[in-house]
From Swiss-Prot:
HAMAP family: DNA_mis_repair. InterPro entries: DNA_mismatch_repair_CS (IPR014762), DNA_mismatch_repair_MutL (IPR020667), DNA_mismatch_S5_2-like (IPR013507), HATPase_C_sf (IPR036890), MutL/Mlh/PMS (IPR002099), MutL/Mlh/Pms-like (IPR038973), MutL_C (IPR014790), MutL_C_dimsub (IPR042120). SMART domains: DNA_mis_repair (SM01340), MutL_C (SM00853). It comes from Pediococcus pentosaceus (strain ATCC 25745 / CCUG 21536 / LMG 10740 / 183-1w). Keywords: DNA damage, DNA repair. Belongs to the DNA mismatch repair MutL/HexB family. One of its GO terms (cellular component) is mismatch repair complex. GO terms for biological process: mismatch repair. SUPFAM superfamilies: ATPase domain of HSP90 chaperone/DNA topoisomerase II/histidine kinase, DNA mismatch repair protein MutL, Ribosomal protein S5 domain 2-like. It comes from the Bacteria. This is DNA mismatch repair protein MutL. This protein is involved in the repair of mismatches in DNA. It is required for dam-dependent methyl-directed DNA mismatch repair. May act as a 'molecular matchmaker', a protein that promotes the formation of a stable complex between two or more DNA-binding proteins in an ATP-dependent manner without itself being part of a final effector complex. GO terms for molecular function: ATP binding; ATP hydrolysis activity; ATP-dependent DNA damage sensor activity; mismatched DNA binding. The gene is mutL.
């Protein structure tokens, strides 16, 4: 048996570095967090070759006393905690004292630091060994340079990606830190090229504009909610501004960026059916709570935490997101979706746009902005822009009221005596519809015509609307089924021929565990043998001829989501049924049916999106139409024409 011995300090530091320092972005994160803990109001980050050759962090924080600099490079040396009790109420970003010795063990590190009234100190480590140390002149703060990262651990270099990928990792973490601390001015350069800069004035909206582009920042709304334990404050995107994955959700706990799937999911759940399938919101949410409720000592990078009363927090987040989006106008501007626009702005506006057009790491498109050579701010030039053009906030048609109708009685009061527009649905399948005197929050539309049996055209005082007839009736159906499924009744339709369902042993066990969930929607499965179930009757709202398919889909929801709850199951079932019963594409409606559909969708609680999040209608304003047909004249051109006349 090999002899047990104690590892050398340098080797121990290199092992620790394997957990703390995975790539250049890890070094940037640890050093910038140290700068923030030191009370810095300005942090400059300079890179060469995406940090592999050099990382330099300059801050104006409190600095380190000259006689404590060498101690700072020892393992588990820190000024941030001193007792066991401090570990359970950490109020700083760092606290373990591992970052500096870990980085120094696998790189060439030089630090210059000074406090307000003390002498400066310069120290140099390479591969964990002290190379030089002495007094030096320095302003208050810390200037630390890391070179030749992983020079003595070449195996680590093999796992690094391209320079561009490593740079994107760095800009990603810097952007998230900038969102966490808008009061800190942060700049980032790579190979002397500036990638981002924040003003440090505390305005998070300006930081959002720097990262996502000014125009996209306009599509984010403020959300704030609190209870006795938590305060949440941040910005979430409108459903029209989404991304293909959830990595654009930034969750902060007491200013610390964390990764938490459940919190991200709570944000998404708050959108309900407003998001398209496969699309995710952009969000920045800062959760403030007593540090004693958060355990940050569970992961080497401190990006995973444990939160007490987590379910209460998740419910609070979903509620806040839902309430904030509830009264917003969600009709997308059709012209706004065009990739490029030719617009006329003043020189001063162009300069503002150029300042905003600083590239971020979240895959933002680069826009071309031409700055004219003129001192006259009133001279107008044409400029090509897209996502970063600052437009006014969209006009909210009206605030939504009476968001929920919890009973079928309310639904029937809302829709009485009007026929549902769908001649593919059997008579009596849906309740009759009736107009309700309610606060106007949807444009008054006048039907014009139909295209390809798919889209309806209508006009209003503010322009042209194009309606997706399938999405519109999906929304109407969804709100009906949501009420029906939520009000489980004893009314069941007996099957002439029972449905037999065979499953694997694993699936059968899971189905039995979720019996109450299935029964919450009126679906009763009886055991019929080892792994077989029988269905003898079904809810009356099942579509005729699709009973077996509907049962199988409902069971699949339970099998595919181990955390399926009654509420989620009812929601999924309502969405499924709404799609099955909706008008399909290439189905031509006559004029009375089309007009009825427009009346019905206007009375929906959310007339703007189908249950899958797709828009029900898009809007071309009168101004948009006049621009497209060149009916709006350049004022300078008009003056010339008048002079010629």
């Amino acid at each position: 048996m090999a002899e047990i011995h104690e590892l050398s300090e340098i080797l121990a530091d290199q092992i620790a570095a394997g957990e703390v320092v995975e790539r250049p972005a890890s070094v940037v994160k640890e050093l910038v967090e140290n700068a923030i803990d030191a009370g810095s109001s300005r942090i400059d980050i300079l890179l060469e070759e995406s940090g592999l050759k050099m990382i330099r962090i300059i801050d104006n924080g409190s600095g380190i006393d000259a006689n404590q600099v060498e101690i700072a490079f020892k393992r588990h040396a820190t000024s941030k905690i001193s007792s066991r009790s401090d570990l359970f109420k950490v109020g700083t970003l760092g606290f373990r004292g591992e970052a500096l010795p870990s980085i120094a063990s696998i790189a060439d590190v030089e630090m210059l630091t000074a406090t307000t009234d003390g002498p400066g100190k310069k120290i140099h480590y390479r591969g964990g060994k002290l190379e030089d140390s002495g007094d030096a002149q320095s302003r208050q703060g810390t200037d630390i340079t890391v070179q030749d990262l992983f020079f003595n651990t070449p195996a680590r270099l093999k796992y690094l990606k391209s320079l561009q990928t490593e740079l994107s990792k760095i800009t990603d973490i810097v952007n998230r830190i900038a969102l966490s601390y808008p009061e800190v001015a942060i700049s980032l350069q790579n190979n002397e090229r500036e990638l981002m800069r924040t003003s440090g004035n505390g305005n998070i909206q300006q930081v959002l504009a720097n990262i996502y582009g000014a125009k996209n920042a306009q599509k984010m709304v403020h959300v704030k909610e609190q209870n006795i334990d938590f305060t949440i404050d941040g910005y979430i995107s409108l459903p029209e501004f989404t991304r293909a994955n959830r990595s654009y959700i930034t969750v902060l706990v007491n200013g610390r960026y964390i990764k938490n799937f459940q919190i991200s999911k709570a944000i998404i759940d708050g959108y309900g059916s407003k998001l398209m399938v496969g699309r995710y919101p952009v969000a920045v949410l800062n959760i403030k709570t007593d540090p004693i409720l958060v355990d940050v000592n569970v992961h080497p990078t401190k990006q995973e935490v444990r939160i007490s009363e987590e379910q209460t927090l998740l419910d609070l987040i979903s509620k806040a997101v839902f309430n904030e989006l509830a009264d917003k106008n969600l009709i997308p501007d059709a012209v706004d979706n065009l990739k490029k626009s030719r617009v006329k702005v003043s020189s001063s506006e162009q300069l503002d746009l150029a300042r905003m057009a600083i590239s971020g790491s979240f895959e933002m498109e680069q826009d071309h902005v031409t700055i004219p050579d003129t001192d006259n701010d009133e001279v107008e030039k044409e400029v090509n822009i897209s996502d970063r053009y600052v437009e006014p906030e969209p006009i909210v048609i009206n605030s939504r009221q009476d968001l929920k109708s919890d009973t079928i009685a309310e639904f029937k009061t809302k829709y009485a005596n009007d026929a549902v527009v769908n001649n593919t649905v059997e008579d009596g399948d849906q309740p009759e519809l009736k107009e309700k005197d309610a606060v106007q929050r949807f444009p008054t539309l006048t039907y014009i015509g139909q295209m390809h049996g798919t889209y309806l055209f209508a006009e209003a005082e503010d322009g042209l609307y194009i309606i997706d007839q399938h999405a519109a009736q999906e929304r109407i159906n969804y709100e009906y089924y949501r009420v029906q499924i939520g009000e489980v009744s004893d009314d069941q339709q007996d099957l002439l021929v029972p449905i037999y369902l065979d499953y694997s042993t694993t699936d059968a066990i899971r189905i039995k565990e979720k019996q109450t969930v299935l029964e919450s929607c009126g679906l009763f499965l009886e055991e019929f043998g080892k792994n077989t179930f029988i269905v003898r009757h079904h809810p009356t709202w099942f579509k005729k001829g699709q009973e077996e398919d509907t049962v199988k889909e409902m069971v699949d929801y339970v099998l595919n989501d181990s955390s399926m709850t009654v509420a989620k199951f009812r929601e999924a079932t309502a969405i499924m049924m709404s799609c099955k019963r909706a008008i399909k594409a290439n189905h031509h409606l006559d004029e009375p049916q089309a007009k009825q559909l427009l009346k019905d969708i206007a009375k929906a609680e959310n007339p703007f999106n189908c249950p899958h999040g797709r828009p029900v209608l898009v809007h071309f304003s009168t101004t948009d139409m006049e621009k497209m047909f060149k009916r709006i004249q350049d004022p300078h051109h008009s003056d010339l024409m008048e002079d010629e006349m």
